[in-house]
Amino acid sequence: MRKLRNTLAAISILFLASCGGNKDYYMFTSFHEPANEGLRYLYSEDGMHWDSVPGVWLKPELGQHQLMRDPSMVRTSDGTYHLVWTTSWKGDLGFGYAYSKDLIHWSEQQMIPVMAHEPTTVNVWAPEIFYDDEAEQFMVVWASCVPGRFEKGIEEEKNNHRLYYITTKDFKTISETKLLYDPGFSSIDATIIKRAKNDYVMVLKDNTRPERNLKVAFADSLTGPYSPASQPFTESFVEGPSVEKIGND
Protein backbone atom coordinates (compact mmCIF):
# COMPACT_ATOMS: atom_id res chain seq x y z
CA MET A 1 0.00 0.00 0.00
CA ARG A 2 1.49 3.32 -0.98
CA LYS A 3 0.29 6.90 -0.71
CA LEU A 4 0.33 8.20 -4.25
CA ARG A 5 0.68 11.85 -5.10
CA ASN A 6 -0.86 13.63 -8.07
CA THR A 7 -3.49 10.87 -8.30
CA LEU A 8 -2.76 7.42 -9.65
CA ALA A 9 -0.90 8.44 -12.79
CA ALA A 10 -2.72 7.44 -15.97
CA ILE A 11 -5.06 5.14 -14.05
CA SER A 12 -6.50 8.21 -12.37
CA ILE A 13 -7.23 9.72 -15.75
CA LEU A 14 -8.98 6.56 -16.89
CA PHE A 15 -11.01 5.70 -13.82
CA LEU A 16 -10.77 8.26 -11.04
CA ALA A 17 -11.48 11.54 -12.77
CA SER A 18 -14.60 12.04 -10.70
CA CYS A 19 -12.51 12.04 -7.53
CA GLY A 20 -10.72 15.27 -8.44
CA GLY A 21 -7.40 15.97 -10.08
CA ASN A 22 -5.02 16.99 -7.29
CA LYS A 23 -5.79 14.71 -4.38
CA ASP A 24 -3.56 12.19 -2.69
CA TYR A 25 -4.62 8.55 -2.70
CA TYR A 26 -3.63 5.32 -1.06
CA MET A 27 -3.19 2.31 -3.31
CA PHE A 28 -3.35 -1.41 -2.63
CA THR A 29 -2.15 -4.21 -4.91
CA SER A 30 -4.36 -7.28 -4.99
CA PHE A 31 -5.41 -10.43 -6.86
CA HIS A 32 -8.49 -12.61 -7.26
CA GLU A 33 -8.51 -16.35 -6.72
CA PRO A 34 -7.44 -18.63 -8.32
CA ALA A 35 -4.73 -15.99 -8.95
CA ASN A 36 -4.14 -16.74 -12.63
CA GLU A 37 -5.71 -13.53 -13.95
CA GLY A 38 -3.15 -11.00 -12.77
CA LEU A 39 -2.54 -7.75 -10.93
CA ARG A 40 -5.46 -5.72 -9.59
CA TYR A 41 -5.61 -2.39 -7.76
CA LEU A 42 -7.73 -0.86 -5.03
CA TYR A 43 -7.66 2.81 -4.01
CA SER A 44 -8.70 4.92 -1.05
CA GLU A 45 -8.79 8.60 -0.10
CA ASP A 46 -8.47 7.96 3.64
CA GLY A 47 -6.78 4.55 3.96
CA MET A 48 -9.86 3.08 5.63
CA HIS A 49 -12.52 2.87 2.92
CA TRP A 50 -11.55 1.14 -0.31
CA ASP A 51 -12.86 0.68 -3.83
CA SER A 52 -11.52 -1.39 -6.70
CA VAL A 53 -10.05 -0.11 -9.95
CA PRO A 54 -11.60 -2.19 -12.76
CA GLY A 55 -9.38 -4.39 -14.86
CA VAL A 56 -6.28 -6.56 -14.74
CA TRP A 57 -3.03 -4.62 -15.16
CA LEU A 58 -0.39 -7.31 -15.52
CA LYS A 59 -1.03 -10.91 -16.53
CA PRO A 60 1.42 -13.42 -15.01
CA GLU A 61 3.74 -15.25 -17.38
CA LEU A 62 6.29 -16.84 -15.04
CA GLY A 63 6.60 -20.08 -13.14
CA GLN A 64 5.14 -23.55 -13.24
CA HIS A 65 1.65 -22.33 -12.36
CA GLN A 66 1.86 -18.81 -13.87
CA LEU A 67 0.14 -17.22 -10.90
CA MET A 68 0.23 -13.74 -9.44
CA ARG A 69 -0.34 -14.07 -5.73
CA ASP A 70 0.71 -11.70 -2.95
CA PRO A 71 1.74 -8.76 -5.19
CA SER A 72 3.88 -6.25 -3.30
CA MET A 73 4.94 -2.89 -4.72
CA VAL A 74 7.01 0.17 -3.84
CA ARG A 75 7.62 3.42 -5.67
CA THR A 76 11.09 4.95 -5.73
CA SER A 77 11.93 8.65 -5.88
CA ASP A 78 12.33 8.59 -9.67
CA GLY A 79 8.66 7.59 -10.02
CA THR A 80 9.28 3.93 -10.89
CA TYR A 81 7.00 1.26 -9.43
CA HIS A 82 8.69 -2.03 -8.53
CA LEU A 83 6.51 -5.13 -8.16
CA VAL A 84 7.23 -8.62 -6.81
CA TRP A 85 4.86 -11.58 -6.50
CA THR A 86 4.43 -15.31 -5.87
CA THR A 87 4.48 -17.28 -9.14
CA SER A 88 3.44 -20.77 -7.98
CA TRP A 89 2.14 -22.60 -4.95
CA LYS A 90 5.04 -25.09 -5.14
CA GLY A 91 7.99 -25.91 -7.35
CA ASP A 92 9.43 -22.50 -8.24
CA LEU A 93 12.73 -21.43 -6.72
CA GLY A 94 12.15 -17.70 -7.11
CA PHE A 95 9.61 -14.89 -7.28
CA GLY A 96 8.40 -12.64 -10.09
CA TYR A 97 9.57 -9.07 -10.68
CA ALA A 98 8.54 -6.26 -13.05
CA TYR A 99 8.63 -2.46 -13.04
CA SER A 100 6.53 0.35 -14.49
CA LYS A 101 6.50 4.14 -14.77
CA ASP A 102 2.71 4.48 -14.96
CA LEU A 103 1.13 1.34 -13.41
CA ILE A 104 -0.24 0.39 -16.84
CA HIS A 105 2.72 -0.47 -19.05
CA TRP A 106 5.03 -2.98 -17.41
CA SER A 107 8.52 -4.24 -18.19
CA GLU A 108 9.30 -7.78 -19.21
CA GLN A 109 8.68 -10.09 -16.27
CA GLN A 110 11.71 -11.67 -14.60
CA MET A 111 12.07 -14.67 -12.33
CA ILE A 112 14.42 -13.82 -9.47
CA PRO A 113 15.88 -17.26 -8.51
CA VAL A 114 16.55 -16.59 -4.85
CA MET A 115 16.38 -20.25 -3.72
CA ALA A 116 18.17 -21.85 -6.68
CA HIS A 117 20.99 -22.80 -4.31
CA GLU A 118 18.51 -24.90 -2.29
CA PRO A 119 17.03 -27.31 -4.88
CA THR A 120 14.81 -29.10 -2.34
CA THR A 121 12.98 -25.87 -1.51
CA VAL A 122 9.23 -26.47 -1.56
CA ASN A 123 8.12 -22.92 -2.33
CA VAL A 124 8.83 -19.20 -2.41
CA TRP A 125 5.83 -17.44 -0.89
CA ALA A 126 4.67 -13.87 -0.41
CA PRO A 127 7.72 -11.79 -1.35
CA GLU A 128 7.49 -8.36 0.27
CA ILE A 129 9.52 -5.50 -1.18
CA PHE A 130 11.02 -2.77 1.01
CA TYR A 131 13.09 0.20 -0.17
CA ASP A 132 15.95 0.99 2.19
CA ASP A 133 16.43 4.75 1.83
CA GLU A 134 19.63 4.71 3.87
CA ALA A 135 21.43 2.05 1.82
CA GLU A 136 19.60 3.10 -1.38
CA GLN A 137 18.69 -0.46 -2.24
CA PHE A 138 15.76 -2.86 -2.17
CA MET A 139 15.23 -5.64 0.32
CA VAL A 140 12.83 -8.49 -0.46
CA VAL A 141 11.72 -10.87 2.28
CA TRP A 142 9.75 -14.06 1.67
CA ALA A 143 8.89 -17.41 3.24
CA SER A 144 10.34 -20.72 2.07
CA CYS A 145 10.26 -24.27 3.34
CA VAL A 146 13.49 -26.28 3.07
CA PRO A 147 12.65 -29.78 4.37
CA GLY A 148 14.82 -30.91 7.27
CA ARG A 149 16.45 -27.52 7.80
CA PHE A 150 14.68 -26.54 11.03
CA GLU A 151 13.16 -28.31 14.00
CA LYS A 152 9.92 -29.80 12.78
CA GLY A 153 7.56 -28.66 15.53
CA ILE A 154 3.89 -29.46 14.98
CA GLU A 155 3.86 -28.72 11.25
CA GLU A 156 4.70 -31.33 8.66
CA GLU A 157 8.14 -31.11 7.08
CA LYS A 158 6.89 -29.47 3.86
CA ASN A 159 5.02 -26.75 5.72
CA ASN A 160 7.80 -25.61 8.06
CA HIS A 161 8.58 -22.14 6.71
CA ARG A 162 11.18 -19.58 7.70
CA LEU A 163 11.80 -16.03 6.49
CA TYR A 164 14.64 -15.23 4.06
CA TYR A 165 15.82 -12.08 2.29
CA ILE A 166 17.98 -10.63 -0.46
CA THR A 167 19.08 -7.08 -1.26
CA THR A 168 19.58 -5.49 -4.66
CA LYS A 169 19.94 -2.08 -6.24
CA ASP A 170 18.62 -2.99 -9.69
CA PHE A 171 17.24 -6.58 -9.71
CA LYS A 172 20.13 -7.51 -11.99
CA THR A 173 22.78 -8.08 -9.35
CA ILE A 174 21.29 -9.88 -6.35
CA SER A 175 22.91 -10.46 -2.97
CA GLU A 176 23.36 -13.87 -1.43
CA THR A 177 20.14 -15.23 0.08
CA LYS A 178 20.22 -15.09 3.87
CA LEU A 179 17.97 -16.23 6.69
CA LEU A 180 16.19 -13.20 8.13
CA TYR A 181 14.19 -14.67 10.99
CA ASP A 182 13.71 -17.98 12.73
CA PRO A 183 11.12 -17.47 15.47
CA GLY A 184 11.09 -21.17 16.32
CA PHE A 185 7.88 -21.89 14.43
CA SER A 186 6.63 -21.92 10.85
CA SER A 187 6.19 -18.29 9.76
CA ILE A 188 5.08 -16.57 6.55
CA ASP A 189 3.74 -13.25 5.22
CA ALA A 190 6.30 -10.91 6.79
CA THR A 191 6.16 -7.19 6.16
CA ILE A 192 8.65 -4.66 7.56
CA ILE A 193 8.01 -1.04 8.52
CA LYS A 194 10.57 1.63 9.37
CA ARG A 195 9.19 3.85 12.14
CA ALA A 196 12.35 5.92 12.55
CA LYS A 197 16.11 5.58 12.20
CA ASN A 198 17.20 2.35 13.92
CA ASP A 199 13.57 1.41 14.61
CA TYR A 200 12.04 -1.39 12.52
CA VAL A 201 8.90 -3.44 13.07
CA MET A 202 8.18 -6.76 11.37
CA VAL A 203 4.63 -8.10 11.24
CA LEU A 204 4.44 -11.82 10.46
CA LYS A 205 2.03 -14.71 10.47
CA ASP A 206 2.51 -17.62 12.85
CA ASN A 207 1.56 -20.38 10.42
CA THR A 208 1.33 -23.18 12.96
CA ARG A 209 -1.88 -24.86 14.05
CA PRO A 210 -3.94 -23.75 15.87
CA GLU A 211 -2.37 -20.27 15.90
CA ARG A 212 -2.57 -18.97 12.31
CA ASN A 213 -2.45 -15.38 13.58
CA LEU A 214 -0.30 -12.24 13.39
CA LYS A 215 2.59 -11.31 15.66
CA VAL A 216 5.26 -8.60 15.68
CA ALA A 217 9.01 -8.43 16.22
CA PHE A 218 11.36 -5.45 16.57
CA ALA A 219 14.91 -4.56 15.52
CA ASP A 220 17.25 -1.58 15.35
CA SER A 221 18.53 -2.74 11.95
CA LEU A 222 16.55 -3.65 8.85
CA THR A 223 18.22 -7.05 8.61
CA GLY A 224 17.98 -7.74 12.33
CA PRO A 225 18.49 -9.43 14.62
CA TYR A 226 14.78 -9.20 15.42
CA SER A 227 13.32 -9.75 18.87
CA PRO A 228 11.33 -12.85 19.79
CA ALA A 229 7.84 -12.75 18.32
CA SER A 230 5.15 -11.12 20.43
CA GLN A 231 1.93 -12.65 21.59
CA PRO A 232 -0.70 -12.61 18.81
CA PHE A 233 -2.60 -9.38 18.32
CA THR A 234 -5.27 -10.88 16.04
CA GLU A 235 -7.65 -13.79 16.15
CA SER A 236 -6.73 -17.03 14.37
CA PHE A 237 -6.87 -17.45 10.59
CA VAL A 238 -5.53 -13.99 9.76
CA GLU A 239 -2.73 -13.48 7.22
CA GLY A 240 -1.24 -11.17 4.61
CA PRO A 241 -0.69 -8.03 6.75
CA SER A 242 -0.18 -4.56 5.27
CA VAL A 243 0.82 -1.54 7.32
CA GLU A 244 0.51 2.16 6.47
CA LYS A 245 0.70 5.35 8.51
CA ILE A 246 -2.62 7.22 8.34
CA GLY A 247 -2.58 10.64 9.97
CA ASN A 248 -1.06 10.22 13.41
CA ASP A 249 -1.84 6.49 13.57
What are these regions (language model features)?
Residues M1-L8:
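Bacterial N-terminal signal peptides that target proteins for export
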Residues A9-A17:
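Bacterial N-terminal signal peptides
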Residues S18-D249:
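Carbohydrate-active catalytic/glycan-binding domains of CAZyme proteins
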